[in-house]
């Protein structure tokens, strides 16, 4: 509803709970809010005394749309849904586009596998986490393997083993694949690992101590020594790890502000043990208070489907939380589970609140320093290349292949805060003459910018090509054909002897080359972006090339038909294991002579690397 006459408009508003949407002249939603009393809350925006942020917003508001809800809880849940849908510029917007990783234990298997997992929890078994990042998962996975020696391999690899793999040799697995441990003993390893995940280290130590004593009484000293080492490792770990007083799952949310920016840090406490922390830097309008940011952050974060249903029993905040009970009730209702929120600074959470706030301040400081550094470098590029407009986004393309084989193109994206890895793309090139870099470049640019024109992304301010004037001409022709305008086309070409620091720069529409000093910060960033595109392209190319060669290696061996090829792969559990095998080991496969084994060995090693 338009607000030409505010007094008349406000009288039409209901006095019950609901959600309101502020819209600008184009009908775009620029703010979403919730209210226990819609009339009273919306009326507050028409007072004379407003803060600068609200004044700036209200100057753009042309209409307000309201949605009535049955109760306050529904209002909070609907507000979070609308914020996610409309991404209003005056709301605190959480940018958290990645699901959280877990450790997954396939308890339904005879010999359960423990592995890294990310995604919807559809497979049967136990999930431990979530962890703040992949590094935390891998660190804990390595620890569990060291302590309890659970297998990590896939089912196909496991079922086709005839000898232990490297994990057994480095004492990270007990090799159930070849019967070195029976099902009962392996289940004990699994049970110990589960107790460890649940924070019941003392119970694990008691069990291991009992087994050690039994082994000693039976004079099985090697086994007793193994249990002794496990106990020592667990006790050492207990001293190193930070343990809370309780045994539950708690999220401690710290918040900090600096120069108008706001940052969060969440400490993840799982089964009484801190497993890591993760920082967040949402888009916050200038003038947003810590309390407002906290109120808008919490529902967005915990109602996101990326949480995968993993909600702690308690949330603790480092700052007072307005409408704490309202948010607590609404989240409990929306998530269909009991949830407590604590914002008082008292035992046993006081030290954790201080630690979370400290982590938030430190992360925000580093984030702003990096942001300022990249913003300055982008400004330096604009000045050094004499570009007409400021730069907020650069895309760089590179082509990688080996003599025309397995050609791959990469696209990396940099912005004011550095690399934007979620926008990186790789393209498998097909249908062009092998080794035709111009053809490959035309294909990747066409595919990329057709998608951008259709609204699948943001056009860059600058397009950077790893190449010279020839590549730049191809890019200009493609963008002209697609009628893409407003993008500055640049290229970086290798200098004499391909030495770093001697590169030449080109800008489309100018005849002269540009040479920047080796110590120029703009030049350094251009090199960094080019090198990142090259790294991303060559990694994708090597993976594609290796896959092709793996698929073709056995087909090239004379005398090996489909059945024998399958028998070899099944015997060794895969082509990589076959490549590691000696001639003697290959000759042990039924139906393979020593002569054929040598031919297989030679063919495998011909394609190594």
From Swiss-Prot:
Pfam families to which the protein is assigned, alphabetical: GIY-YIG, HHH_5, UVR, UvrC_RNaseH, UvrC_RNaseH_dom
The GIY-YIG domain, residue ranges: 15-92
NCBIfam families, per the entry: PRK00558.1-5, uvrC
GO molecular function: DNA binding; excinuclease ABC activity
Name of the protein: UvrABC system protein C
GO biological process, one term: nucleotide-excision repair
Every UVR domain range: 202-237
Subunit structure: Interacts with UvrB in an incision complex.
Organism: Coxiella burnetii (strain CbuK_Q154) (Coxiella burnetii (strain Q154))
Family: Belongs to the UvrC family.
Transcription regulation listed as a keyword: no
PANTHER family in alphabetical order: UVRABC SYSTEM PROTEIN C, UVRC/OXIDOREDUCTASE
Origin: domain of life: Bacteria
CDD domains listed in its UniProt record: GIY-YIG_UvrC_Cho
Disulfide bridge partners, by residue number: none
Signal sequence, start to end: none
InterPro entries: GIY-YIG_endonuc, GIY-YIG_endonuc_sf, GIY-YIG_UvrC_Cho, Hlx-hairpin-Hlx_DNA-bd_motif, RuvA_2-like, UVR_dom, UVR_dom_sf, UvrABC_protein_C
Record's keyword annotation contains Kinase: no
One Gene Ontology term, aspect cellular component: excinuclease repair complex
